[in-house]
A protein has these predicted regions:
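Cofactor-binding loops of NAD(P)H-dependent oxidoreductases
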Residues: 52
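N-terminal Rossmann-like NAD(P) cofactor-binding module of classical short-chain dehydrogenase/reductase
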Residues: 64, 68-71, 99
Length: 179
């Protein structure tokens, strides 16, 4: 397959599974990473690696050059700006698909929480950029379960009224690659 996909956030837990699945499915994969040494240690020479910052439009434009699509899997402060920057560049660069990782609790009624407000703004930018897109709102990857256990006891946050639905990061990688 000749389609090149840029993965932003490919060194993270979910980004890693997406990166590996895309390559397994025959896509050419370019990983944009702030820490090139970490990316090299994680992926070796099998992937095209691009050192850059998603908040820098010049870096992002270079990373997206020649790509069919892009997957955004960024957390923290760069999440919203990375999606907005991709949305600004995607039409002019001829991207044909954008995928973005949001979250299961990202809804208007939760916009009082800063991270949720940022995710909503990122979703809006992606959905309005004019390029076909898929937004994923996953729950919790089961690989995170150890973070919920302290001293042999499970930690629960809030008044849990509905069951949590866990997923495997590898399954998520397959869903994104299929999109």
């Amino acid at each position: 397959m000749d389609k090149q996909i840029l993965v932003i956030g490919g060194t993270g837990m979910l980004g890693d599974s997406v990166t590996r699945q895309l390559r397994e499915d025959g896509f050419k994969v370019r990983v944009m990473a702030r820490d090139l040494q970490k990316a090299q240690a994680q992926f070796g020479a099998a992937y095209e690696l691009f050192a850059g910052d998603v908040t820098d439009l010049g870096d992002l434009e270079q990373a997206l050059a020649g790509c069919y699509g892009v997957h955004i899997s960024v957390g923290g402060p760069a999440d919203q700006i990375s999606a907005e920057n991709v949305a600004a560049l995607a039409p002019e660069l001829g991207l044909e698909h954008v995928t973005y990782v949001s979250g299961s609790t990202v809804r208007d009624e939760n916009s009082w929480f800063p991270m949720t407000a940022q995710k909503l703004a990122a979703e809006s930018a992606v959905s309005q950029c004019g390029v076909p897109y898929t937004i994923f709102r996953p729950t919790w990857p089961m690989e995170q379960l150890p973070r919920f256990v302290r001293d042999g006891r499970a930690t629960l946050v809030g008044d849990i009224k509905t069951p949590w639905h866990w997923f495997a990061a590898a399954d998520f990688g397959r869903m994104v690659a299929n999109a």
